[in-house]
Amino acid sequence: MCAVPPPHISITGLGYLGLPLAQKFYQHSSRVAAIKRSLTSDDINLPIHLDTFDLGSSDAFQTALWRHHADKPVWFFLLPPSSLTHYADTVKQWAELARACNVQHLIFTSSTSVYGDTARECDETATPDPQTESARQILATEQYLLDSGVPNIDILRLGGLYCAERHPVSRLVQKQNIQGGNRPINIVHRNIAVESLFQTAFNPGGRRLKNIIEPRHPTRREFFTEEAAKLDLPAPDFAPDDSRGKIIRTVCDNGLSL
């Protein structure tokens, strides 16, 4: 158990990260409210308050819909850009609502994709270079949050997520002649990401940015071949190449103060 009781929380996005995070907070006696688009059979017996509605609807941010969230001092936003048509604008509205509810701490899962694909070493001081529309939306969202007026903002840029139940190697082994096998990989196990989110909620510290990645950086070929063996899958078919890629690090355990 934690020495200090965890805060009560609101989670927007009760999925791959949100569900284990909600369960972890509940197990530590935190009151949890969450939002997702639709209810599944797995959600029925969750010991949390769960609201279901579409964040893209015109009335999604009416205060009445968030009455079970308004008293929670920490709000998480865990949805990726693929889940929303107008991602940055939606997160901006979420942050504006949080400020209106006097929420003191927002925690947002960003992505290391904002650094682009150029071969270089990146920590939180590196200049972003988003190459995809998704990465550009994420970077715009970060700025909206920093400008929101909420006193404590944590932006966690996650590396590529993986775990045994939902592993990217399961898709890779279905392909042939995969490119980029020699590029270093920037990954983070889901358990590490969940623990990082959990610990961040205990320590608000103004506006902060942190990369959440594992310290090891094997090549894509090395990592996915090893992971395939663990899951009793055939080795992925990587094409020979000498391509290079970025390596992502973090400046310190607490990230970069902004």
Model-identified regions with their sequence ranges:
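Mid/C-terminal beta-alpha module of Rossmann-like enzyme folds, strongest
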Residues: 196-244
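Conserved beta-loop-beta element that borders a ligand/cofactor-binding pocket
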Residues: 143-164
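Conserved Rossmann-fold cofactor-binding substructure of NAD(P)-dependent oxidoreductases
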Residues: 49-72
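NAD(P)-cofactor binding segment of oxidoreductase domains
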Residues: 72-108, 140
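Conserved Rossmann-fold NAD(P)-dependent oxidoreductase catalytic core, especially the SDR/UDP-sugar
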Residues: 95-131
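Substrate-positioning beta->alpha
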Residues: 168-170, 179-201
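Conserved N-terminal Rossmann-fold NAD(P)-binding element of oxidoreductases
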Residues: 9-13
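N-terminal Rossmann-fold NAD(P) dinucleotide-binding loop
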Residues: 18-19
